[in-house]
Amino acid sequence: MSLFELLEPTIAGMGYELVDIEQSAPGRLLRVFVDKKDGAITLADCVAVSNHLGQLLAVENIDYNRLEVSSPGLDRPLKKRADFVRFVGESIRIRLRIALQGQRNFVGTLTEVGDDALMLNVDGKLLQFELKNLEKARLIPKL
């Protein structure tokens, strides 16, 4: 079982969404990014998740020196299909695994999400991208 698979149901049970996990060298830093669908993550939310995960990781005998829990930030990564569905209408930046017309990086407005592809309005042109070809995707913050 992966660490993501271990933590996701626990975090979901607390009313949060597990966005991403970063690990430095084994046994060092474990960074967990969580979000809420109905609002911004607060410091109290991060503390609650951190306390709960600390106990879970001890029980599961997961080796780490330091646990950090934080929000994914304004430019949060989009990883799952549900992330894309949630942010239809928002500006995003994507990087492709395999170039499309010689280009791997695109910026545009997310207009539609299908079962295995998404539509992005890039400079007035609708372009379709397969979800499996996405290397990275992030929201572009509204400032």
From Swiss-Prot:
Keywords noted in UniProt: Cytoplasm, Ribosome biogenesis
CDD domains linked to this entry: YlxS_C
Coiled coil: none
Top-level taxon: Bacteria
Cellular component per GO, a single term: cytosol
Annotated PANTHER family: RIBOSOME MATURATION FACTOR RIMP
Described purpose of this protein according to its UniProt entry: Required for maturation of 30S ribosomal subunits.
Protein name: Ribosome maturation factor RimP
Organism for this UniProt entry: Nitrosomonas eutropha (strain DSM 101675 / C91 / Nm57)
